[in-house]
């Protein structure tokens, strides 16, 4: 079972610059691949896949705009996949055509994937390790157990930064007792079960 844990982070000035660059580059790649997809469809009446768009980014965009190489590759790939999801929703659910992203959006975010320990949460030092950022100070108010799958870094309109850690946790099923029970909700008591147990109102 996948579960997300959201924490506030406190990046230093250097980390804030890198985060801002990542926001901007993800927006740029989203817009460029959306425009590329639209151009191919208008010229050739052919729909291309998210893999085609990702290849276009790696072979063309990173060649023409070398500063994209300074950004976490998973963040750029996920920006393309988000564009593809919006594009697929347009055709399957007749939603509005995907819009180009603006740098003036109040909510900014990017997602990176876990691989080879590139994301780690240290509850003792209250720091989170993230690609290209190293260790970021965080308020780790809630612990978890499980395997990290991804991390989404975001900045809200107030300027605060957050990271949402997606974790795969173990799903524990309750033992089957083959015992049925009825529950009578009451006014004086919260409920009375068919086996005679009374739960009082708090």
Residue ranges and their predicted role:
Residues 1-202:
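Nucleic-acid substrate recognition interfaces
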């Amino acid at each position: 079972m996948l579960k997300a844990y959201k924490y506030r982070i406190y990046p230093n000035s250097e980390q804030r610059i890198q985060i801002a660059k990542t926001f901007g580059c993800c927006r740029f790649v989203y817009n460029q691949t959306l425009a590329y997809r639209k151009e191919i469809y208008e010229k050739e009446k052919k729909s291309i896949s998210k893999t085609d768009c990702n290849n276009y980014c790696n072979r063309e965009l990173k060649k023409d705009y070398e500063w994209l190489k300074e950004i976490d590759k998973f963040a750029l790939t996920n920006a393309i996949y988000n564009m593809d999801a919006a594009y697929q929703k347009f055709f399957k659910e007749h939603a509005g055509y995907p819009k180009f992203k603006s740098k003036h959006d109040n909510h900014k975010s990017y997602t990176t994937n876990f691989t080879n320990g590139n994301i780690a949460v240290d509850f003792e030092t209250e720091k989170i390790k993230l690609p290209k950022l190293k260790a970021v100070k965080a308020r780790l108010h809630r612990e978890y157990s499980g395997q990290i799958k991804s991390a989404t870094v975001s900045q809200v309109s107030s300027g605060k930064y957050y990271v949402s850690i997606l974790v795969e946790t173990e799903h524990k099923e309750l033992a089957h007792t083959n015992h049925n029970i009825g529950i009578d909700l009451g006014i004086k008591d919260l409920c009375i079960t068919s086996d005679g147990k009374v739960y009082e109102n708090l």
